[in-house]
From Swiss-Prot:
<dbReference type="GO" id="GO:0000070">
    <property type="term" value="P:mitotic sister chromatid segregation"/>
</dbReference>
<keyword id="KW-0378">Hydrolase</keyword>
<keyword id="KW-0788">Thiol protease</keyword>
<dbReference type="GO" id="GO:0004197">
    <property type="term" value="F:cysteine-type endopeptidase activity"/>
</dbReference>
<dbReference type="GO" id="GO:1902104">
    <property type="term" value="P:positive regulation of metaphase/anaphase transition of meiotic cell cycle"/>
</dbReference>
<dbReference type="GO" id="GO:0005634">
    <property type="term" value="C:nucleus"/>
</dbReference>
<keyword id="KW-0539">Nucleus</keyword>
<keyword id="KW-0206">Cytoskeleton</keyword>
<dbReference type="GO" id="GO:0006508">
    <property type="term" value="P:proteolysis"/>
</dbReference>
<dbReference type="GO" id="GO:0051307">
    <property type="term" value="P:meiotic chromosome separation"/>
</dbReference>
<keyword id="KW-0106">Calcium</keyword>
<comment type="subunit">
    <text>May bind calcium. Interacts with PDS1. Interacts with MCD1.</text>
</comment>
<protein>
    <recommendedName>
        <fullName>Separin</fullName>
        <ecNumber>3.4.22.49</ecNumber>
    </recommendedName>
</protein>
<keyword id="KW-0159">Chromosome partition</keyword>
<dbReference type="Pfam" id="PF03568">
    <property type="entry name" value="Peptidase_C50"/>
</dbReference>
<dbReference type="GO" id="GO:0031536">
    <property type="term" value="P:positive regulation of exit from mitosis"/>
</dbReference>
<dbReference type="GO" id="GO:1990520">
    <property type="term" value="C:separase-securin complex"/>
</dbReference>
């Protein structure tokens, strides 16, 4: 292998003579030995560290070029400028190192070599030596202090391209300086192990090296044989012509001359003979080969064999002073004997450790010096030696033995390197580390670290870097001080350990692993600029740390961007982002990636999406598409970015971009293999978010087939489990979900469910485990609510929320991805909880969670989450009809929407347009967004459903089928109504009283032809406001053509009925149940009134049950949920996902029907009347169960029906009445407030106050009178307790039909009354319950007459009302009614239960004149009533003994002194007279005391503010199973808090849920004086004040006592109407 002529080494000759201008090596010793410390690190070049590298390199090249030019002409002048050159080189090395620009170092090294050659050629040998060391030290981790270190330096990736040349130059300098004797041992070791130190370079300058060997042959006297053999080896090995080196003799002669006796005297250098000879011998095998025995004397050889055969102790073979065996050139056979002796020697436990170590040093030093090739015996002995050391290391207890151990391990490590045994070298490193720990020796630890790094550098395998970092974690942990830890860390954290792998992926992997495992162990609090580390390394290292005041301003822009992106500090000048970057910088090729990573993190730090679309498109188009061109693997920096980008796109619902990015990633699977699972996960979520059904189905099938989670890594398992959650949610298969996530997966991968981190997962993974479990519980809740399992849904959702809230406290410590996932899960859990409680109609819990959500919104920070929360709250406030909050949240939501990217986020855009009622734009936006993909998504259809439209069942997803059915029924209803409106007869149908059942079926054959025809009016040109009413409105005239298609309407109504009956009730919200019950009622009412329904009774049972269900369910769930132990919400085991005994709406519907049946079969002498309001028509709905009569009836009262007959009549709709009532109550509450009463000081002020109160009382009276007259009028008898005499009734009924036959035009022409429609008996009975003595009798009777006429009209019997003689009807009917009442027997219903709906609760129905004298109590529902009755065996009235155990609370707040004075004496007498009674007076009761009073008493009386809710939590009352009958006589104790479509909440219901059979309270605030009078009268009438046991004589039941006591109030309506009773009628007995 010949040297190329243009190489600078050709200019150097080993025979170049020394001149007088040569510089002494001693003159530069300080420079040689301290070059690393004395050379300034600051650059002499213009510009700083962040300057453009091209300019700096250009200036450096100019300096080098100038030096070379000057040196060629005047070396002395050039040498004077060498300092400038060195500083320039130093700056360039620092620049390359700092900027990690190792791709440019080769050219700089070449320049440096050229300078060295110039110096050597010009005999500046001292400077040349210095430059050699300078060059080496600037490009290697382990520093050289002299040429000796250079010669024996190992090859690594950092020097393998120049080290052999540098060694040749060093050897030349040694020759020229005639320093061979000084360096001879190192030179001999160099050539003895030339395979390691020289020949590893494939580009070795063999010619120059061979000439140098020949030169050493020439100048040495005792090593001629050695260098001669080496010369012959290289001639043969490199195929060099012998004549080129020695021309006057042949190679054979040269070989023979080596055996000259003068050459054979090698002295101590003979120890290298075997090594040199073995290298020579491997190449020569002919007859001309020199034999080792020819070199050695015969006597010497036989002496060795004789000594070995004598079987002496192994220690006798050792030359302790020389640290080697007594002989050299040991044969393989002789070595085997020695090794066997050594083995026996080690097994002798009696030897002192120091002696043994000394012998082992001798053995292994000799083996290395001999250059013996490795074999099994040597390696076996090596392992035995290591085992011996490990076994006996603890017995080393002095410094000399420790030093011997260090020496031995040093030799063993060199042998491992010689033999290329990295695993055994690792064992030596482990022994060294153990010794450092045992001896607490930093020097041992430092040797351990350096040896480990040497191993890394020599092996040049970047794949081992992680293993090395893990070792350094242990090294650093064992270091005794902070400074020592830093020193050890510096051994690892430097550019050299990067092995010239300048890909971004390796840089990040190395630095982040170093940070995680090692840097954190340093526990430093200040910035340290670790030597030999690049700014990129520092930016990654400190970017992951929390250390403040990092001087990143000295770094390049790209490094600063990396640092800022990792650290989350975005303080870069925006102008810097647009500057031109250093083109030679390592990071320049990653500029786009780094820039968009920074921009993404910048946006995320500001919680914006301003650049999100741009970033994504840039990444896809400019970077991702070129991934095939990249030879390197993806970096963790990019991986984290892509994961974060996918996460942020998903988080902000940029679903379209998320799909595009995910699909691109999947198309580049080779490069993005580690990202593909993430892409799959987000792709599925995007498809699901956009309702792209077919695509989601394809992804679902793909995900179900991949990955074995039992063998997967934890992070992969977490991701895949998350995807599987989406799959199961899509399938809506609760059972499969529960089995997989409750049993299968926990058994397969328990660490995924380790909430307590018993597996000691790293914090980042542990957080992800918690987030996964939050998602599992959230989605379990969602699946449960889909399946109608409300209880399980609440429990799981509460668990998710508790976990999420616990994490929220530490949100600032979470990664961005975890933080976003947490916010999403937390908001989802709130939404779910509120939705669940909306589902069950629980207003109290909805309000609690909505307020909590409102409270934390500001802490959520992310606009998308804030907007979604505000949007959700806006919809919630619409449901609860909190108009003010609704408007406020809409305004805030619109402001939050301004921060969103509406173009990319179709979900938020459609929400925004929907909330702002821009429905046309909503549909247009969907078309624009999806374009030609519109057919692939269900989203437009979903919004059609939200907009109240119905869609084809074939395209409707199963979970939205109920909504589709409700919309369809509602739309069909609108069409029916439209048809009715077009017809002059039927358009006023809902201005007429309608009843079910209303008529008896008539046999068609007996009816005249005109009866079944659609009725026609004798009028023309009717307007929409016209109505078939009095003569003034129905003139005679020509019949008009009818537009009402009865058959079509009936068909639609029956279809509506079937659709409503097909609904799966479990899937409906409670307010939707109310809506369908209203629709069902309307459908049934119209069908019943325009056709004869043969199964009206069955239909009413169904309708009553459906109406009662939304009243019953909230109370049931309130009780059940309240009794759940809180520990269930903190039990995070997924095995709890499978929860039995869930309450189902379907089963409860059956229960409601059963309760209705039980009530009807009880045969109790009661009426159960339901009062409700229909929001669709504005009608008042009355339903009645009559157990004694086995009859169900239903009335639909139009509240403006009198107005339709008399245009002058005052109109009072239900909303208007409610508004007036609330106004009166609110004004009354204000007048009784402390703020108002405390200001009354003068007589005039008191008079003014009373005037206001009287006026309010009068307004209340007028309102009740209006309600009574305009709403109920003739149908007041519906509430009457009178029982009609059956025999008298039949006579009246015959007369009734006779009167109709005489007066109705439709019947006058026909002789047989049996041919005509007959109305139901209960309708006729209403006439008999009218009292002719009443002033408004005629008005009431007229109301009933129109009721009957409308029944006939809607069933097809046409009568023009202006042709009827109403006066005659009035006279004839009045006569018959008087006859009946004159002969009837008095018989009445014992008690009336009012089932008052939430919308009707506030009205004091009991104070209407036709109800005020009745025994009335309220109940929330049929089920509640039936439960109370069954509990007390259906015995009424309920008799309660009060001869003992009475509990009373009087004036607990201490501010009702007058009330206290009034009742103190009475209560004290009761305490004295009735054993076990208890009184708490003028002090606040403890919760436990109050609960005991409620549970353990026969009667509980509370006289104070409110209902005592301030002293006991409602949930504690609800937990009770039995509560005493209770009198809550404070203000608003029976008031309900209204929340629109949700069921109201109040103290009264709390007591009923706690098992109270009867509770009395006030509907609104009352004045203490009046309510005290009422209470006193009440106590008197029901026998509570009696001092004797005679309670059974004159005492009244509580319900009668209440009705009789109202009149004592000064303000009979404002105060007297407030008390109401809930529960059973009770009578107190002794």
């Amino acid at each position: 292998m010949m040297v190329k002529q243009e190489e600078p080494l050709n200019e150097i000759s080993p025979n170049t003579p020394m001149t007088s201008k040569s510089y002494l090596l001693n003159d530069t010793l300080s420079k040689v030995h301290h070059s690393g410390q004395t050379r300034p690190l600051t650059s002499v070049l213009s510009g700083d560290a962040s300057s453009n590298s091209i300019g700096i390199l250009a200036m450096h090249n100019n300096i080098i070029r100038d030096f070379t030019k000057i040196a060629s002409n005047n070396i002395d002048l050039a040498i004077e400028d060498i300092t400038t050159v060195d500083h320039s080189l130093n700056s360039i090395y620092s620049l390359l190192k700092s900027h990690h620009m190792w791709g440019h170092i080769n050219s700089t090294v070449k320049q440096h070599l050229m300078i060295i050659v110039k110096l050597i050629n010009n005999n500046a040998l001292g400077l040349a030596s210095s430059e050699i060391i300078f060059l080496f030290n600037e490009t290697n981790l382990f520093q050289a202090h002299s040429l000796k270190n250079i010669l024996l330096a190992d090859f690594s990736t950092w020097n393998d391209y120049y080290l052999s040349n540098l060694k040749i130059l060093a050897l030349q300098i040694i020759l020229k300086r005639k320093l061979v004797d000084e360096y001879l041992p190192h030179i001999l070791e160099l050539f003895s192990h030339d395979k390691r130190y020289l020949l590893k370079d494939p580009n070795l300058k063999a010619h120059a090296l061979t000439k140098i060997v020949l030169s050493f042959f020439s100048v040495t006297t005792s090593c001629k044989v050695l260098f001669g053999l080496k010369f012959l080896q290289y001639i043969k090995q490199f195929k060099l012509p012998f004549k080129k080196f020695i021309s006057n003799i042949t190679v054979e002669c040269f070989s023979k001359n080596l055996l000259h006796k003068n050459y054979l005297e090698m002295g101590p250098n003979k120890i290298y003979l075997n090594s040199f000879y073995l290298s020579y011998s491997m190449l020569y095998d002919g007859l001309d080969k020199i034999m080792l025995l020819d070199i050695l004397s015969y006597e010497e050889t036989t002496e060795v064999q004789r000594a070995i055969k004598s079987k002496k102790e192994f220690n006798e073979y050792c030359n302790m002073s020389e640290n080697r065996l007594l002989w050299s050139c040991i044969s393989v056979d002789d070595l085997n004997v020695i090794l066997e002796n050594a083995t026996n020697f080690l097994q002798n436990k009696g030897k002192h450790i120091s002696a043994t170590l000394k012998c082992l040093v001798c053995l292994w030093s000799t083996i290395r010096l001999e250059g013996l090739p490795k074999n099994k015996d040597i390696l076996r002995q090596f392992d035995c030696t290591v085992i011996y050391i490990n076994s006996n290391i603890k017995s080393i207890n002095d410094e000399s033995a420790a030093a011997l151990l260090s020496e031995l391990l040093g030799v063993l490590s060199e042998i491992c390197i010689d033999y290329k045994e990295p695993k055994r070298l690792s064992n030596i490193i482990s022994v060294l580390f153990n010794a450092s720990v045992l001896f607490k020796s930093h020097s041992f630890l430092l040797k351990t670290a350096n040896l480990e790094i040497s191993n890394v550098l020599i092996s040049n395998d970047s794949k081992t870097s992680h293993r090395t970092i893990l070792k350094f974690e242990k090294f650093i942990s064992s270091a005794q001080s902070a400074q020592k830890k830093i020193e050890i860390f510096s051994c690892l954290f430097n550019v050299y350990c990067m092995l010239r792998n300048d890909t971004l992926s390796f840089v990040f992997d190395f630095c982040q692993n170093a940070f995680i495992h090692c840097f954190t162990r340093l526990k430093i609090t200040k910035f340290i600029e670790f030597s030999n580390s690049s700014e990129i390394m520092l930016s990654v290292l400190y970017g992951n740390s929390s250390i403040e005041n990092i001087p990143s301003e000295n770094w390049s822009q790209l490094s600063r961007m990396i640092f800022c992106s990792l650290r989350g500090i975005f303080d870069l000048d925006p102008l810097e982002l647009n500057n031109t970057f250093d083109k030679l910088h390592l990071l320049n090729k990653y500029e786009l990636l780094i820039r968009i990573v920074y921009l993404l993190n910048l946006d995320m730090s500001k919680h914006l999406t301003t650049n999100l679309s741009k970033i994504t498109k840039l990444y896809i188009n400019k970077w991702l598409q070129k991934s095939d061109e990249k030879a390197e693997r993806i970096s963790s920096f990019e991986m984290d970015f892509v994961k974060m980008l996918l996460c942020y796109l998903n988080f902000n619902n940029f679903d379209k971009l998320s799909i595009e990015l995910s699909l691109c990633i999947k198309s580049k699977e080779k490069y993005y293999s580690s990202i593909v699972p993430y892409a799959d996960n987000y792709l599925l979520e995007a498809y699901l978010s956009l309702y792209m059904i077919d695509d989601a189905l394809m992804m679902k099938n793909q995900l179900q087939k991949t990955m074995n989670l039992s063998t997967a890594k934890i992070e992969q398992a977490l991701l895949h489990a998350s995807s599987l959650i989406n799959v199961h949610l899509w399938d809506s298969d609760l059972t499969a979900f529960q089995i997989y996530f409750g049993k299968t997966l926990p058994a397969m991968k328990p660490e995924l469910f380790d909430i307590n981190n018993d597996h000691n997962l790293p914090m980042s993974l542990y957080i992800k485990v918690i987030l996964l479990n939050i998602k599992i519980f959230n989605e379990s809740a969602k699946l449960n609510i889909k399946a109608g399992n409300v209880i399980s849904a609440v429990i799981d959702c509460r668990k998710a929320q508790n976990l999420a809230l616990s994490l929220l406290k530490k949100k600032n410590k979470l990664s961005q991805g975890s933080r976003l996932a947490l916010l999403k899960s937390l908001s989802f859990s709130f939404f779910q909880l509120i939705k669940i409680h909306i589902r069950i109609g629980s207003a109290r819990d909805c309000e609690f969670y909505s307020k909590e959500l409102s409270r934390i919104i500001s802490d959520l920070e992310e606009p998308i989450i804030v907007y979604r929360c505000l949007h959700f709250l806006h919809r919630y406030y619409m449901i609860t009809e909190q108009t003010c909050l609704q408007n406020i949240t809409l305004g805030k939501a619109n402001k939050a929407f301004d921060y969103l990217d509406a173009e990319a986020d179709i979900t938020s855009l459609t929400m925004f347009l929907y909330d702002n009622k821009e429905f046309v734009k909503l549909e247009q936006s969907l078309v624009l967004y999806f374009g030609d993909q519109l057919e692939k998504t269900f989203l437009p259809n979903l919004w059609k459903l939200h907009l109240g439209k119905d869609i084809d069942d074939s395209i409707c997803l199963s979970e939205y089928m109920p909504k589709n059915v409700i919309n369809r029924v509602h739309n069909m209803w609108q069409k029916v109504m439209s048809q009715l409106e077009e017809d002059p007869f039927f358009k006023g149908m809902f201005e007429s009283t309608l009843g079910i059942p209303s008529s008896l079926p008539v046999i068609p054959s007996t009816m005249p032809n005109n009866i079944l025809k659609t009725p026609s009016k004798h009028s023309t040109g009717l307007k929409l406001c016209d109505s078939p009413r009095s003569s003034s409105m129905t003139p005679r005239g020509k019949n008009i053509r009818q537009k009402f298609d009865r058959i079509a309407a009936i068909s639609k109504l029956k279809q509506m009925k079937e659709l409503l009956e097909s609904l799966k009730l479990d899937t409906l919200d409670n307010h939707e149940l109310s809506k369908i019950s209203s629709l069902s009622s309307l459908t049934l009412t119209i069908l019943s009134n325009i056709t004869s329904i043969h199964n009206a009774e069955s239909s009413l049972i169904t309708n009553f049950s459906l109406t009662d269900l939304p009243r019953h369910m909230p109370l049931l769930f309130d009780k059940v949920l309240n009794n759940i132990d809180n520990k269930n919400y903190r039990e995070f085991r997924v095995s709890s996902l499978i929860a039995p005994n869930n309450i189902s709406t379907i089963t409860e519907s059956i229960r409601v029907s059963a309760a209705q049946k039980d009530l009807m079969e009880s045969n109790l002498n009661i009426n159960v009347i339901t009062i409700d309001f229909c929001p669709i028509t504005g009608n008042l709905l009355l339903s009645k169960l009559e157990p004694r009569r086995k009859r169900r009836t239903h009335l639909r009262l139009p509240l403006i029906r009198s107005n339709s007959r008399d245009l002058d009549e005052v109109h009072l709709s239900f909303p208007e009445a409610t508004k007036k009532l609330l106004s009166i109550i609110n004004e009354s509450n204000q007048t009784t407030s402390v703020e108002v009463t405390n200001k009354i000081k003068t007589r005039e002020e008191r008079k003014s106050w009373w005037t206001t109160r009287y006026d309010l009382d009068k307004r209340m009276q007028q309102l009740l009178n209006n309600i009574e007259n305009s709403w109920f009028n003739g149908v007041q008898g519906f509430f009457s307790p009178e029982v009609v005499d059956n025999s008298l009734f039949e006579k009246f009924k015959d007369k009734f039909y006779e009167i109709l036959h005489q007066n109705l035009p439709s019947r006058k022409l026909y002789g047989n009354p049996a041919m005509f429609i007959k109305v139901e008996d209960w309708v006729i009975e209403l006439f008999l319950k009218l009292n002719p003595q009443e002033i408004d009798f005629l008005s009431k009777m007229e109301d009933l007459i129109y009721f009957v006429l409308d029944i006939l009209l809607f069933h097809g019997e046409e009568n023009a009302y202006d042709e009827i003689d109403f006066s005659m009807l009035h006279v004839q009917l009045e006569e018959q009614i008087k006859k009946y009442r004159a002969t009837m027997t008095t018989n009445s219903i014992f008690h009336t239960f009012l089932v008052v709906s939430s919308s009707c609760h506030l009205f004091p129905w009991e104070c209407l004149s036709f109800l005020k004298d009745l025994s009335i109590t309220r109940v929330p529902s049929y089920v509640c009533l039936n439960k109370l009755l069954s509990r007390f065996h259906y015995q009424l009235p309920l008799q309660v003994t009060i001869e003992d155990n009475i509990s009373m609370i009087l004036n607990p707040n201490g501010d009702l002194s007058r009330t206290e004075s009034k009742f103190k004496g009475m209560f004290q007498k009761i305490i004295d007279a009735k054993p076990s009674s208890q009184l708490v007076m003028n002090e606040k009761p403890e919760e436990e005391t109050l609960l005991k009073m409620l549970q353990n008493s026969n009667l509980f009386v509370y006289i104070g503010h409110g209902g005592g809710e301030q002293y006991v939590r409602s949930k504690e009352i609800k937990k009770c199973t039995k509560i005493a009958p209770s009198f809550l006589l404070g203000c608003s104790s029976a008031a309900m808090k209204y929340y629109g479509k949700l069921e109201p909440t109040g103290t009264i219901y709390t007591y009923l849920l706690g098992g109270c059979p009867m509770v009395l309270g006030n509907l609104w605030d009352v004045t203490d004086k009046d309510i005290d009078k009422f209470s006193e009268e009440l106590f008197e009438k029901m026998g509570f004040r009696c001092n004797t046991d005679d309670l059974n004589g004159n005492s009244l039941s509580v319900s009668y006592a209440v009705s009789k006591s109202r009149g004592v109030c000064h303000l009979r309506y404002l105060n007297g109407a407030a008390p109401v009773i809930y529960g059973l009628p009770i009578k107190f007995v002794s």
